[in-house]
Amino acid sequence: MREASELKAIASNAITGAIVGTLCAVAANVLGVQQLLRRPELALYVPAAVVGGALGVTRLRPLLWIAAGIIALLCVVIAYTPLTPALARPLIRRDSIPNRVDAIAVLAAGFTRDSLMRSETLDRLLSGLALARRGLAPVLLVSRERRSYAGHSTSDSADLHNVTALAASTTPIVFVDSVFTTRTEALRMKTMARKSGWTTLAVVTSPMHSRRACATFEAVGFKVVCVPATLRESGLHPGSNAEDRLRAFRSWLYETFATDSYRRRGWIR
């Protein structure tokens, strides 16, 4: 009878630990930890459940509750306070826009599996088209990503063409193909710039990506005018809701690690 009771207690602790571990993984995903792995198809829920279940039957199980409490508190602080806008400020670079530059560069921000631009990509493109309409540059460079899903190569090429056609821009648009990182965008555009004699670029990207992106383009030899795009639901404004602030925190977390990575590789100063 005692053995059965002990086994029941162990099973209960294991199940509780697995549940708490899974919830920790879910909350960590909301905070943006998952995207740091750069493997969107890799879910951490099962490993977290296994680790939580294993810890749940040991004397270390209080650590699960401590971790859960810290993550929960962090979620609440980020969602309901202006912490993220304060953290984001050092990552944002906004230069004065001159009367003329050699080209406008709109950087990519990913696309969906059904080959449509993500909202952030669309916002960047619209901001770039607005600058082109003002006559800031004689040409608009637009990054175009290409990825493999289920063994098939896909891109948001058709969606990009549809939106630019709707804009009816009189400025020539040049698509820069097969970019994967900010670094490859800068290198590919630099190759094109050498042939065309472009030296000064207005780089249009998301606010929190702006400082790293513009530093990357400067590192390959461009003179850069940094232009943060106008983003919907950016989470950086005083009236932002909890969902937007959490989304902004994910961007901040990613950019913080990405900036450190670029510095260590010598791609930016």
Language-model-detected regions and their locations in the chain:
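Short, Lys/Arg-rich, polar N-terminal cytosolic tail immediately upstream
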Residues: M1-L7
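Membrane-embedded alpha-helical segments of integral membrane proteins
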Residues: A9-V57
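Transmembrane helix-loop junctions in multipass membrane proteins, especially transporters and channels
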Residues: V33, P90, R263-W267
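Short glycine-centered helix-capping/turn motifs at secondary-structure transition points
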Residues: Q35, A132-G135, G266
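A structural signal for short, hydrophobic/glycine-enriched beta-strand patches
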Residues: E41, V77-L246
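Aromatic-rich membrane-interfacial microdomains
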Residues: E41-A48, L63, A67-A68, L87-L91
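Internal/C-terminal transmembrane anchor helices
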Residues: P62-P85
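A transmembrane-helix-recognition feature enriched in membrane-embedded lipid enzymes
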Residues: R245-R269
